[in-house]
Amino acid sequence: MRHRIKGRRLNVTSSHRQSMLANMAVALVMHEQIKTTLPKAKELRPYIEAIITKAKKADLTVRRSVLSKIKDKKAVEKIINILGVRYKDRPGGYTRIVKSGFRYGDLAPIAYIEFVDRDINAKGKKMYQDASEEIKN
């Protein structure tokens, strides 16, 4: 029985899991939407939501606490200055998980995890411009 056991192992060591969650959190913050497997998305959701809830206070202690979880300074700045302000009045539920079928190679369930009320231009603005230029040509 797995009573009182929190989280998923994801078939990796604990240090690998912590590093992976931190890296996925940076990617989610910078792009505001990422594609990953469903169990990883479900594990990332409480990790990033706790960080954003802390970031709504936006003082030095919170900044240091967020920096201890996420090692990227640009991501921490975005969390404190943009996401903390954006979700100031929202009492949780900052992310959504959208199931997206199965991966071709191993049939792993794939999902998108994204911020609610996200900035559409945050994810690959240059990529969208290149695609629109190709359509025009």
UniProtKB/Swiss-Prot annotation:
InterPro entries: Ribosomal_bL17, Ribosomal_bL17_CS, Ribosomal_bL17_sf
GO biological process annotation, one example: translation
Keywords attached to this entry: Ribonucleoprotein, Ribosomal protein
A Pfam family matched in the record: Ribosomal_L17
GO MF term set: structural constituent of ribosome
Superkingdom assignment: Bacteria
GO CC terms of this entry: cytosolic large ribosomal subunit
Gene3D superfamilies found in the cross-reference section: Ribosomal protein L17
Family membership noted in the UniProt record: Belongs to the bacterial ribosomal protein bL17 family.
Subunit structure, as described in the record: Part of the 50S ribosomal subunit. Contacts protein L32.
Alphabetized PANTHER family for the sequence: LARGE RIBOSOMAL SUBUNIT PROTEIN BL17M, RIBOSOMAL PROTEIN L17
Protein name as catalogued: Large ribosomal subunit protein bL17
Organism for this UniProt entry: Rickettsia typhi (strain ATCC VR-144 / Wilmington)
